[in-house]
């Protein structure tokens, strides 16, 4: 299930001129992702919540723009999941399936900040900071930070500057 909410409103002069305030949230909840429990198994398993496959992800934020300037603050969240799996048993007998096991990977959250300006004929400039709160990527059950680099950003706090000039 995906849910996208967006609310925009005009705001009065806040000392910098009249502007526009935008609140948004993008939410994804994966209910099922079925596949074979393991190669050769006829048993199907819902993979959501297993290692590296969180069930939910969402982003929410606020944008404020006025005149030729804007500022944006975004919180990015990735849900939790279990570290490992083990064979499924029923009355002591293997069923050909797997179940979640091991510890639980915590939810992960970071903040991004972006400021921008349209300078007319001089172009557009943007300054931003990814992972503003400098949250480390979450390690796997053995303490390895490189395991989930496709899921978490392992760069740490990163600032950037962009100047776009069209001619």
Feature-to-residue mapping (PLM):
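Outer-envelope beta-barrel architecture signal
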Residues: 15-21, 56-58, 67-69, 109-111, ...
């Amino acid at each position: 299930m995906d849910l996208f909410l967006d609310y925009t409103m005009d705001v009065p002069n806040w000392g910098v001129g009249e502007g526009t305030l935008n609140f948004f949230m993008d939410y994804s909840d994966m209910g099922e992702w079925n596949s074979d429990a393991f190669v050769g198994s006829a048993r199907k398993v819902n993979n959501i919540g297993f290692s590296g496959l969180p069930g939910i992800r969402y982003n929410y934020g606020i944008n404020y723009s006025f005149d030729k300037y804007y500022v944006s603050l975004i919180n990015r969240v990735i849900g939790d999941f279990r570290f490992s799996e083990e064979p499924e048993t029923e009355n002591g007998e293997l069923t050909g399936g797997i179940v979640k096991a091991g510890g639980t990977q915590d939810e992960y959250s970071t903040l991004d900040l972006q400021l921008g300006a349209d300078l007319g004929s001089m172009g557009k400039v943007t300054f931003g900071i990814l992972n503003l709160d400098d949250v480390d990527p979450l390690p796997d059950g053995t303490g390895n930070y490189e395991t989930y680099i496709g899921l978490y950003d392992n760069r740490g706090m990163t600032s950037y500057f962009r100047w776009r000039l069209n001619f």
